[in-house]
Amino acid sequence: MHPEVSEQQADGATEPSLEESAGDHSGAGPGVRKEEINETKETCVGPSTTSCQSQKQQSGDSRLDCRSGYARNDRDDRGPRMTKEFLQKLCKQHKLYITPALNDTLYLHFKGFDRIENLEEYTGLRCLWLECNGIQRIENLQAQSELRCLFLQVNLLHKIENLEPLQKLDALNLSNNYIKTIENLSCLPVLNTLQMAHNRLETVADIQHLRECLRLCVLDLSHNMLSDPEILSVLESMPCLRVLNLMGNPVTKHIPNYRRTVTVRLKQLTYLDDRPVFPKDRACAEAWARGGYAAEKEERLQWESREHKKITDSLEALAMIKRRAEERKKARDKGETPLPDSEESSSTSPEAQDKPPLGETQQKIEVLVEESFKAKDELFPEKPGGEEELAVVADRTMEEPDLPGSLAQSQTPLVATAEESTSSVAATDGTGIEDTEAIALENKERLFIDDLPDLEDVDGMDISMEDQTKETGIPKIQVISSLSDDSDPELNDSPLPMLEHTPTGSTGVLSNIFAVCKDSSKAARVPLTDIYEPRATTAPETQGQVFSTTPPRPLIQELEEDGRGENESKQSLPAQSSEDGDSQLPEATLLGDRAENEAQSSLDLGKPSPRASLEDIEFGLD
């Protein structure tokens, strides 16, 4: 519909109204009518001319210019910008560093950015996420020289460019873009992974640049429009290619026996499309390339037989382990020593394993026996010959097969006789276990007869005679108090070797006697119950001898000779009775009765000679 026709229709439509209005206004002049008509024409023509101009602008190239201008204005005014303030706020939101250079990762995906900008301060970035934005060009990455990973998938990129500053880039993701040619990647010397899925790659020339990417190991070309089988020649020239994805391309249908062919031609390939390339698959593919399907079938059977043999061997090994465990368990239940495994028994025999412990045990035994004989020679220099006895003991231990039992049997008399200083070495003498046991029994019997053999060498020690008599005389005073008056003392039955080294003066003897009397009341029951009663069960004859060797008569004679000792005894008896209470009164009365009876007998006998008095004193101390 043309503008002139519309103007005529508009004029025709307005003329009747004007005539009517003129009829209504018959009183108005013709000049007024013309002016009103002109005004209405101007008002009617104005909008039509503007609409015509707008229609002309919409036609042709001017229409595209208007659209691009409007898009630029909307993008500049309405779209989000990658400003410094926005980046700082984003770092704070993701709890990153406020200082830009300290950040190594920046998450800018799903933000709607249309360009890369204001990243000059982020010099330490190693990973940059720009996924799912509206970016149309790769730019402004000069400051990111440390970048390792760049994710630009799902954007509006049409070309690969401006990647020269990224000399350390390892992974580049350009999937879901509009890229038609792979280019400008040879400037990345360490590029390892390239993802180009869902792009516009079609021919061999589009991927020819991959020949220059010598370090590329992972390549994803899935869901493109590659259809020429010659792309395999380009992929063969990549020496480090390990992972390849060609799914979604027409070329997979154009290559016969696609998987076998690609596996054979790409020698280093370990993963193709959606699954790995196993050694068995590669061997079968190579067999197919040599002899067809028959060779492939034969190779597959060989691999299956080897795998089956491996499984059966493992099962047999498990069964063998189980059987050996059961045998060892049965032997252990029977009390037998379980035999070692066949491999261990072939390499090292049980005799060879037992030799080192046997030698070590023998050495220890010899050292122990030698030390014991040295100690014996030091104590008894008049009995040499320890070396000969050592040789005898060594020969005996060599002949005995059961070492632990012999050691246990030989250690028993040693412990039994270790209570005596002089008899500890004597237990190790002899040529057999029976001799040592006999010596131990003799020592036990002599222990109750000679009660104080250990105190023969006490002269060099710093122990007073009063303390010595306290230790040795307490049980004897208790026995004296427990004896009856009509007991017959046997003075010549047991000599006392302790008195050989005691002083013979009356003062020293009396002091020892009364020192014993002072301490006898305090420990009257303990020695009787703990020492003499257990020994009475083992050696009843010796107990009677000990009891009979304590006559009261010499004690009373000495008391008559020295009045001072009598006074001390009188003072000690009340003190003991007062301290011990009523429990000690019977002993005091017994001593008083004995004193009276023995005083009467001493008057009848008369005063003895000094020699007899000394002998009586020795027997009285017993």
UniProtKB/Swiss-Prot annotation:
Modified sites of kind Phosphoserine: 349, 464, 487
Any one cellular-component term (Gene Ontology): axoneme
Listed SUPFAM superfamilies: Outer arm dynein light chain 1
Region span, Disordered: 1-80, 326-360, 399-431, 480-503, 525-622
Main subcellular location: other
Biased composition range(s): Low complexity: 48-59, 337-351, 415-428
LRR repeat placement: 101-123, 124-145, 146-167, 168-189, 190-211, 215-236
The entry's keywords: Cell projection, Cilium, Leucine-rich repeat, Phosphoprotein, Repeat
Entry keyword Membrane: no
Coiled coil: none
Domain of life: Eukaryota
Compartment list: Cell projection, Cilium
Any GO BP annotation: cilium assembly
Residue ranges annotated for the LRRCT domain, each copy included: 249-288
UniProt biased composition (Polar residues): 1-11, 539-550
An MF annotation (GO) of this entry: dynein complex binding
Biased segments, Basic and acidic residues type: 32-42, 62-80, 326-336
PANTHER family: DYNEIN AXONEMAL ASSEMBLY FACTOR 1, PROTEIN PHOSPHATASE 1 REGULATORY SUBUNIT SDS22-RELATED
Entry similarity comment: Belongs to the DNAAF1 family.
Protein purpose: Cilium-specific protein required for the stability of the ciliary architecture. Plays a role in cytoplasmic preassembly of dynein arms. Involved in regulation of microtubule-based cilia and actin-based brush border microvilli.
Protein name: Dynein axonemal assembly factor 1
